[in-house]
Amino acid sequence: MRIIARLLTVVTQSAFLLVFFMTNAHAVITVTDEYGEHSFEQAPQRVVALNWDILEQVLALNVEPIAAPNLPGYRQWVVNPTAPESIEDIGTRAEPNLEKIASLKPDVILAASPQQDLIPLLKQIAPVIYLPNFSENEAAAETAIRHFRTLGKLFNKEALAEQKLTQLDTSFEQMRQRIRHYYSEPLSVLVMRFSTPNTVFLATENSTTDYVARKLGLHAPIKEAPRAWGVKQDRINRLQNLQNSYVLYVQPFPEERKLKDSPLWQAMPFVKKQRVNSVRAVWAYGGAMSLQYTAEAITDSLIELAPKQ
């Protein structure tokens, strides 16, 4: 009887192990992009990121890609997270070096709208996940957050992705409270960029800038309908009626000295009231974590301006 009992135990354990291994053998990672579902037997290890927003997203998830385009440009304009020197540079975002990409033998290629026409060729090298953003029909911030979750799933980093998104929401509220310490709500603030001393880029309602401003409790005195890339170019005289608003302009702007010497600029109501300040350089076309960098820069600029009130 003991022998039979032992045999039954062994058979039961063997059956359990067989089911366990069969289940895990078929456990796949499935993610969805603009073209549908894609399945992977395991989290990709050799990753090529073809756009800066995607590069930022994967680095924020502690995934180091093997290659990305125009890394000097990324380090100048995007900055955070830092792109390690070990990442191979594969040319430009619009025309990445396909031969070099193929030689690196990636497990997955992450692409965005600048590479859409290359997808048939890229698919011959490795599976492609297509994550476009910044079209007229995209709410850019929400799309960046959705892509962050998609990449978290792809790389088995879902818990980290959710942790960082929770921290993002918490930081928005903390920064909003910091601003309220110095200013009463509602606070009218225009966050913009300069093209020339006479031309400005205004953030549209689908831009990351507008999303961040709303999260901080700021009200835009000029509202623009959604557009591709989240900006509308306009003449500087569009700002001449901002009597009770604050104006923040994002760096860099090489002609800043020329602007400040301009009689037209000096005549602006917000300039006369010392309600204008610069914002340190932040990237408006990044991933989910760029929203936090933008919020921090806007908050710091407003607080720097507060003692003058």
Place the predicted regions along the sequence by residue.
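N-terminal signal peptide c-region/cleavage motif recognized by signal peptidases
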Residues: 20-24
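Short helix-initiation/N-cap motifs at beta->coil->alpha
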Residues: 33-35, 90-98, 226-236
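A short, structured surface patch at a secondary-structure boundary
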Residues: 46, 52-100
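Alpha-helical, coiled-coil/dimerization segments enriched in small aliphatic residues
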Residues: 72-77, 202-231
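Proline-aspartate-enriched helix->loop->beta-strand connector
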Residues: 105-111, 127, 239, 244-245
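Extracytoplasmic substrate-binding proteins
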Residues: 121-195, 284, 289-309
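Structured C-terminal subdomain patch of bacterial secreted/periplasmic proteins
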Residues: 146, 242-309
